[in-house]
């Protein structure tokens, strides 16, 4: 057994040599490592801003539905633009698209900071600018997710890459909320938004350093008119023809729809646990602390077996931990429940992304991700609206507990409807490197 004293005695380099710790396989790919480093910094800033927005609106309004409005303005652009964003990720250079989207989000954060600094900020400003950021994000995610397999030359390292993506998200989400609480307490709300604007420069620098990225592009279709509609139809038909991908999307949507209660966390912190901004920051980071632990364990694995069984177990734990979060009236128990939510969510996210990307050819990967984005972004963001409405009518604890129960029921129904997802092992034929049949 490896103890802490043993680790301190022999040191990190010896642990690497003895095989207890190894550099994740994905980080051996230079271009991916550049992107990962930039994302780690940028996600920290974005998480600072996200949780600061919830807190900011809570200071401007005492109505839960006001905070839930953030979920609405974040989900509407996803529903409207995701299909077009998927086409764009297949039609245009993905690296160039990400440069445009990251720059747009940087300017949005800067505008939030300046409006807050000048004392002109109102709730509608927050909604409008968050909506603009959501439009950019709707185009950013399909391009960025689809770019990852272009940066990884060995398909067996793809699960490690998505584990590292999740580590970047969760490490940023650990540090970001904590920093957000500290910055708000000691410097001011506007400083959070300015710091987020600066953090986007890390991704832009990484994209510049990695240079051009090879990509399959279907050149015979047009960007407008029937070409675009035909491309969208092709992406949807592909998903409908692949039960593994379709079922993972349905599971993702309903689980996150019921168990999304992040917008209620300020009300749990202030009205149930009676804690301030710093403790709120730690509660916000708890999910990601659990996520980082799960991410690190999975990142060490180049190949994961029994992926379907593990996926269903993770989503079930996600629902159970959400119920515990709703029941808890103690600060440390709430942190523990949220850590369980984060760990389960990290495992399920890594597995879903790996399954989808490996089972989708490069030429259609952007469109697949665009359709999937409607489900995995729409689920939690619509869930934030649902939880706000239920909390308004029946109280915050009931909203959270009922959501966790709904998640567990959704897992059971998907397992019965699509047994092939539960039986998915991870050694099925890989389609990620398949050529565009239209170009053959």
Task: Please place each PLM-identified region on the residue numbering.
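Interfacial helix-capping/hinge residues at the ends of transmembrane alpha-helices
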Residues: 38, 54, 145, 149, ...
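Hydrophobic alpha-helical transmembrane segments
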Residues: 123-134, 160-218, 278, 283-285, ...
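Hydrophobic core of transmembrane alpha-helices in multi-pass small-molecule transporters
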Residues: 40, 121-139, 253, 333-347
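Helix-loop boundary and gating motifs at the non-cytosolic
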Residues: 17-76, 237-287
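Transmembrane alpha-helical cores of Major Facilitator Superfamily
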Residues: 40, 72, 76, 103, ...
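Loop-to-transmembrane helix entry/capping segments in MFS-fold secondary transporters
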Residues: 64-65, 155-165, 277, 362-371
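Flexible cytoplasmic inter-helical loops of multi-pass small-molecule transporters
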Residues: 15, 155, 209-234, 426-434
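C-terminal transmembrane bundle of multi-pass solute transporters/carriers
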Residues: 3-9, 79-84, 91, 95-97, ...
């Amino acid at each position: 057994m490896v103890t802490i004293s043993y680790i301190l005695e022999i040191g990190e380099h010896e642990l690497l040599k003895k095989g207890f710790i190894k550099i994740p396989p994905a980080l051996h790919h230079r271009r991916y490592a550049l992107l990962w480093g930039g994302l780690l910094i940028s996600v920290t800033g974005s998480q600072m801003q996200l949780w600061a927005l919830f807190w900011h609106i809570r200071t401007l309004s005492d109505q839960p539905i006001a905070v839930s409005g953030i979920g609405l303005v974040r989900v509407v652009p996803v529903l409207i633009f995701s299909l077009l964003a998927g086409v764009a990720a297949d039609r245009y250079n993905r690296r160039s698209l990400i440069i445009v989207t990251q720059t747009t989000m940087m300017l949005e954060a800067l505008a939030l900071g300046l409006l807050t600094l000048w004392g002109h900020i109102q709730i509608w400003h927050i909604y409008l600018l968050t909506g603009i950021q959501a439009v950019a994000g709707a185009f950013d995610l399909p391009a960025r997710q689809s770019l990852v397999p272009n940066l990884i030359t060995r398909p067996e390292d793809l699960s490690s890459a998505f584990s590292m993506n999740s580590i970047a998200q969760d490490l940023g989400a650990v540090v970001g909320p904590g920093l957000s609480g500290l910055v708000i307490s000691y410097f001011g709300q506007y400083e959070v938004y300015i710091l987020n604007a600066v953090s986007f420069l890390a991704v832009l620098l990484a994209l510049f350093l990695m240079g051009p990225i090879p990509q399959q592009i279907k050149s015979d279709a047009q960007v407008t008119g029937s070409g675009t509609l035909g491309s969208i139809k092709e992406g949807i038909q592909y998903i409908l023809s692949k039960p593994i991908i379709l079922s993972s999307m349905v599971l993702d949507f309903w689980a996150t729809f019921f168990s999304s209660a992040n917008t209620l966390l300020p009300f749990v912190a202030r009205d149930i646990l009676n804690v301030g901004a710093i403790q709120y920051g730690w509660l916000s980071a708890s999910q990601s602390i659990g996520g980082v632990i799960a991410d690190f364990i999975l990142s060490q694995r180049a190949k994961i077996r029994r992926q379907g069984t593990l996926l269903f177990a993770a989503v079930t734990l996600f629902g159970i931990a959400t119920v515990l979060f709703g029941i808890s009236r103690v600060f440390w128990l709430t942190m523990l429940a949220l850590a369980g939510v984060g760990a389960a969510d990290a495992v399920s996210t890594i597995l879903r992304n790996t399954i989808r990307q490996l089972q989708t050819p490069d030429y259609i990967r952007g469109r697949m991700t665009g359709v999937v984005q409607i489900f995995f972004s729409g689920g939690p963001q619509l869930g934030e609206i649902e939880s706000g409405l239920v909390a308004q009518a029946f109280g915050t604890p009931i909203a959270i507990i009922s959501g966790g129960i709904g998640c567990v029921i959704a897992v059971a129904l998907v397992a019965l409807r699509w047994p092939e997802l539960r039986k998915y092992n991870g050694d099925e034929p890989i389609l990620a490197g398949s050529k565009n049949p239209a170009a053959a």
